[in-house]
Amino acid sequence: MKHPTRTTRLAVPALAFALALAATACAGGKQDEKGAANSGKGGRLTIATGPTTGVYYQIGGGLAELISDNLDGYRATAATTGASVQNIQGLQAGSYDIAFSLLDTAQDAVEGKGSFDKPQSIEALTRLYPNYTQILVRADSGITSLRDMRGKRISTGAPNSGTEVIARRLLSAAGLDPVKDVSAQRLALPESVDAMKDNTIDALIWSGGLPTSGVTDLVTSLKDKVRFLDVTAQLPALSNTHGGVYQKGTIPAAVYHQPADVPTIVVPNVLLVKKGFDPRLAGKIADLVYDKKNALEKVNAAATEIDPAQAGNTAPVPLNPGAANALKTLTQRP
């Protein structure tokens, strides 16, 4: 796995466009227009992303721009959401056409467990970049391990987010009850950052690409008043319970200007659609992700870790047939 070696500034025009897209996104849209889009006849496509200071939102806006500019008859918009769980629920309800999700949450969805009471009819367009578990604690909190979070005020992520799924699993792996043993604050990233600045929480748990602008803001503002927490001691317990979806990774020191690299736990992201999504359109969107990857990299450096060699590795989530056909040719491209 390649890791970024420096913090990359967001391209201002691309980010501005992404912000505009998300600000004007309509989750529902006109059902006839959306139905036509899903069947490959042109129309509006709504992409479910995440909070405004997260990477899903930025790269989702970039993808919406690529679709609108390169696929005749389509206009795509990026919707701000609570992220993974909400995104999958929205796919099922028909509120969104395309969705970003962590693979562990998507695995729960197809297996009908965790936040999902029955298997969800979803398919993948491609695997994306990895999310890094980024846990920041106040330097004066006394927290040096997850077990030290007992009785502390912890942001476990927004309701129905992939971050919340990982946060609860990590706390459980450390021997803590995520509901009873910590004062869990179910905050989205922007609110978590504000709460850390205001000293109303002791730590935040976040799962996102590198760099995440909200995390950059926090460490830039508070400097040595916050520090990252190494949680890799919980990896064996996570793997024993949830399989191989979790892996060890590293947050390079240069990304957030830290004194040393931070060992952490990573999980892949996937781009999802509802089963039955037009295969020709699915193939075109999958092609765009790789043919125009450099444009996504300008929006956020996390896109540099979108790996063509891993594009089809979305198990246990099945690939959309059209996307699967498109991805077969990736390694043959110049």
Where are these regions (language model features)?
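Bacterial signal peptide processing site
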Residues: A27-K30
